[in-house]
Regions:
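Short glycine-enriched nucleophile-adjacent loop
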Residues: 223-234
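Conserved alpha/beta-hydrolase
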Residues: 107-133
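Short beta-strand element of the alpha/beta-hydrolase
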Residues: 84-93
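N-terminal cap/lid segment of alpha/beta-hydrolase-fold proteins
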Residues: 26-82
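Conserved acidic catalytic loop of the alpha/beta-hydrolase fold
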Residues: 194-215
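A conserved short beta-strand
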Residues: 233-250
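The feature captures the conserved acid-bearing segment of alpha/beta-hydrolase catalytic domains
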Residues: 246-322, 326-328
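Catalytic active-site module of serine/aspartate enzymes centered on a nucleophile-bearing elbow/loop
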Residues: 337, 341-372
Length: 372
C-alpha cells in the first residue's frame, strides 16, 4: 500500500476543505428543517356579475355570461402540533403576500420564522392585487402599470425610510446590496382595479369565517382595513399592526387632523359599537426609525410623524375605553434603523421576537385547549 500517496491525498483534501471554509465567509447559523402537516391555497370572498340574457354555447355573445372576481387568494402552511391561533398576514399598499415571504436579501421572512415557532400562517393577496387580480368592475381588463411618478422607485426609497436617495441612512436595517434593492423594487405590485374598502374587508372577513379564530397582522395601508375587519368579525382575536397609515376612533372622539408638510393626516371615525369590538381584543401598533420628531420640509417623511401621532392617540383611546392596547416606537426601546418594512429588515428576527413575546404575554400562543 502506498502510504506516502495516501498522506499526500489526505493533506490535499484538508487544505481544500480549509480553503473552502475560509472563502465561504462567516459561518451561517444552522436553520431547523421546516416540517409541515399541510399546505395549500384557496380563494375567499368575491362577487359575481352576470349579463342579462341567455348564454348560447353555439353562438356565444356577452348575453348570459358571468364574471367571478373581487376574491382574495390565500396560501396557508400548517406545522405539526400547531398552536391554536394561526397568524393571518395582510400586506400593505402596492404590495402582495411577498411582503411576508423570503426577504429581499434572501433570509427567512415572517412566514417561515413563525412556522418554525409552531404557528400556522395564512398569507394572502387582497382583491385586485397580485394573484387576486380578477375584478368584476372592469372585466378582464388590467389597468396599465403606471410609469414613474413622485412615488416611483426612488420616491419610495425615501417614503419608506430606507434613506435619502441615493444614500442609505446610517445604520439602516435594510441590506445595502444592490441586488436586494432590486428585489424589493420588483415586489411592488399594481392594482388591477380600484378596491373599495368594503370589498377588501369582506374578503378577509370571509377568510376568518372559513378558518376560524386567528391573530391578524397588518402593515401600512392594510392597517385601517384591519381595524374594520376586527370590528366586523369576532373571530379576529388580536391585531398587531406595523406602521398603519390610518387609525380608527369612535365617531365623536376623532382627534383633530395633524398638519404635516405632506398634507393633513386624519383619523377615521367608526361607529362606537364597532370601536368597542376592538376594545375587547389585544391590539399593538409598531413604528420604526427615522421618523421626524418635529415638522420636516420633506413631506414623504413628515407624513409618518402625523400618522404615528394619531395612531398613538388611538392606543390611548382604546385604553381609555378599557382596552388592552400597546404602542411601540422601536427607537424608544433601543431598536434602531428600521424602515417601513420591519418584518423584512435585517433585524427581522428581533422584530419577530417582539411579536412572539407579545403573543405569549397575551396568552395567544397556546396549544391544545383554549384560544378559541
Amino acid at each position: 500500500m502506498n502510504y506516502q500517496r495516501i498522506i499526500k491525498l489526505s493533506t490535499l483534501v484538508a487544505i481544500l476543505a480549509l480553503c473552502t471554509t475560509a472563502s465561504a465567509g462567516p459561518p451561517q447559523q444552522a436553520k431547523s428543517t421546516i416540517v409541515l402537516a399541510d399546505q395549500g391555497s384557496f380563494l375567499v370572498g368575491g362577487n359575481v356579475v352576470t349579463n342579462p340574457g341567455v348564454f348560447d354555447p353555439v353562438n356565444p355573445t356577452t348575453a348570459g355570461q358571468s364574471i367571478h372576481g373581487d376574491a382574495a387568494y390565500v396560501q396557508y402552511q400548517m406545522p405539526p402540533n400547531a398552536r391554536n391561533l394561526p397568524l393571518v398576514m395582510w400586506h400593505g399598499g402596492g404590495q402582495f403576500s411577498k411582503t411576508w415571504e423570503t426577504t429581499p436579501d434572501g433570509r427567512d421572512g415572517f412566514q417561515n420564522i413563525f412556522i418554525r415557532q409552531g404557528y400556522s400562517t395564512y398569507i394572502f393577496d387582497q382583491p385586485h392585487r397580485g394573484r387576486s387580480g380578477r375584478s368584476t368592475t372592469n372585466g378582464n381588463a388590467i389597468n396599465a402599470v403606471p410609469g414613474p411618478t413622485t412615488t416611483g422607485e426612488q420616491g419610495i426609497f425615501v417614503r419608506f425610510r430606507i434613506g435619502i436617495w441615493p444614500n442609505y441612512y446610517p445604520g439602516v436595517q435594510f441590506s445595502t446590496d444592490p441586488d436586494a434593492l432590486v428585489q424589493w423594487w420588483l415586489q411592488q405590485t399594481p392594482d388591477t382595479a380600484p378596491t373599495p374598502i368594503n370589498v377588501a374587508v369582506a374578503a378577509v372577513s370571509a377568510l376568518y369565517d372559513k378558518i376560524g379564530p386567528a391573530v391578524l397582522l397588518t402593515h401600512s395601508a392594510s392597517g385601517i382595513l384591519g381595524w374594520l375587519t376586527g370590528a366586523a368579525n369576532e373571530k379576529v382575536k388580536a391585531i398587531y399592526s406595523y406602521e398603519p397609515v390610518q387609525c380608527a376612533f369612535p365617531i365623536g372622539e376623532v382627534p383633530p387632523p395633524v398638519p404635516t408638510s405632506g398634507g393633513a393626516v386624519t383619523g377615521l371615525g367608526i361607529p362606537p359599537a364597532d370601536f368597542e369590538k376592538l376594545v375587547k381584543i389585544p391590539v399593538a401598533i409598531i413604528y420604526g426609525d427615522n421618523i421626524p420628531s418635529d415638522q420636516s420640509p420633506n413631506g414623504n417623511l413628515d407624513l409618518w410623524r402625523g400618522r404615528m401621532a394619531l395612531c398613538k392617540q388611538m392606543v390611548a383611546t382604546l385604553k381609555a375605553h378599557g382596552g388592552d392596547a400597546t404602542f411601540v416606537h422601536l427607537p424608544e426601546i433601543g431598536i434602531t434603523g428600521n424602515t417601513h418594512f420591519p418584518m423584512s429588515d435585517l433585524n427581522n428576527a428581533t422584530i419577530g421576537s417582539l411579536l412572539s413575546d407579545w403573543l405569549r404575554a397575551k396568552g395567544l400562543d397556546k396549544r391544545g385547549q383554549g384560544n378559541t
